[in-house]
């Protein structure tokens, strides 16, 4: 099994290019199911989740016309098997995003329930309720969602909770429904806007993406075309947090500061100097970080996907911070690993109290999920001595060449077998 070996203590200097966003690329790949015409996607990151999604789409009947670095062209002219098996859904929760498009395009879908995962329960009741409101007949049998419909009908759907994949599934389904769908309490994440822009480029009629009410007027068919996936705001935030923790001066290229307002505000609160341009962000850190308290919540609030990385930063801050996780009930698994590096953290329910200490000490640690892996890399970069991060297969789901990108700005990090 592969591991990362990190020798901490180096400041980071230079430039890093940001990849396309995992959490935008995966729904956009699913959108290809909505048209019989070829559809090209650019700025796709090279990640394990993308490979898994392409394998799922192929099982469904999608042909991969081109798969070159950065560009993938797909044809869903013949959907032969509108199914996503448990094996697919359990390795990648975004597989649930084929449900809405398959039902809209073919009138049927046979999709495994995702079940829980390391970070918490991953219910899909809002997806199911929304599709039922649009006229789908849905039964759950042996852990599978069996859905069928003649044609989906537009409906007014008020979601009980803000759900990103739920909003994306229902928005995609509604593009081919008869009549108008109104999604209330919709997620406002930039990835929802990116998907809406992709669908609009295919001929969908969508208004309001980025607000909590999205209105979709169904059309008879969507056409092919192309879409450029937005830059990864979580990869961007991860590198910015690494520089804030290690000290140094790094510019991230090919990113979007407007998707990271709250994260940039928290990094400034930690003591970083930040400059932003059209497609770049420069962060310079010359002091020990100040503690930053935060509470995760749906966009535009602080993202749950950045909580773990900020905990590494707070672990060496000059004071105490309070970090509250409100999205997932089990997203503090990195705490136990950070304490192996001597971090001083107490967890009370969904709140972690982090007492910053001057120095972490290297140790062997185990990655438990995607963003916990990123947290442990940052912790290793600031710790004195050697840190070995095990189970990094989680990392490869969501970060493209992370160790190469960090090494390029001066980090001592390498992958070993
Ligand atoms: C709102 C939010 O921050 N969502 C995050 C969530 O998206 P993801 O789309 O995976 O999760 P959701 O946004 O759907 O879930 C948000 C919350 O709603 C609950 N829920 C969801 C669907 C449903 O049908 N019923 C239900 O109760 C979930 O248990 C969770 O507590 O994880 C992703 C990966 O870490 C992050 O990129 C997203 O930012
Ligand atoms: C946990 C994540 O992804 P997923 O929802 O695919 O598990 C993530 O992107 O941080």
Swiss-Prot record:
Residues annotated for UDP-N-acetyl-alpha-D-glucosamine binding in this entry: 93, 122-126, 305, 327
MF terms (GO), sorted A to Z: UDP-N-acetylglucosamine 1-carboxyvinyltransferase activity
Pfam families referenced in this protein's UniProt entry, alphabetically: EPSP_synthase (PF00275)
Pathway the protein takes part in: Cell wall biogenesis; peptidoglycan biosynthesis
GO biological process: cell division; cell wall organization; peptidoglycan biosynthetic process; regulation of cell shape; UDP-N-acetylgalactosamine biosynthetic process
CC per GO annotation: cytoplasm
Active site residues of this protein: 117 (proton donor)
Location of the protein in the cell: Cytoplasm
Keyword field: Cell cycle, Cell division, Cell shape, Cell wall biogenesis/degradation, Cytoplasm, Peptidoglycan synthesis, Pyruvate, Transferase
EC number: 2.5.1.7
Enzyme class: transferase
List of residues binding phosphoenolpyruvate: 22-23
Modified residues (2-(S-cysteinyl)pyruvic acid O-phosphothioketal): 117
Reaction it catalyzes: phosphoenolpyruvate + UDP-N-acetyl-alpha-D-glucosamine = UDP-N-acetyl-3-O-(1-carboxyvinyl)-alpha-D-glucosamine + phosphate
Main subcellular location of this protein, as a coarse class: cytoplasm
Family: Belongs to the EPSP synthase family. MurA subfamily.
NCBIfam families: murA, PRK09369.1
Functional summary from the UniProt entry: Cell wall formation. Adds enolpyruvyl to UDP-N-acetylglucosamine.
Protein name as it appears in the record: UDP-N-acetylglucosamine 1-carboxyvinyltransferase
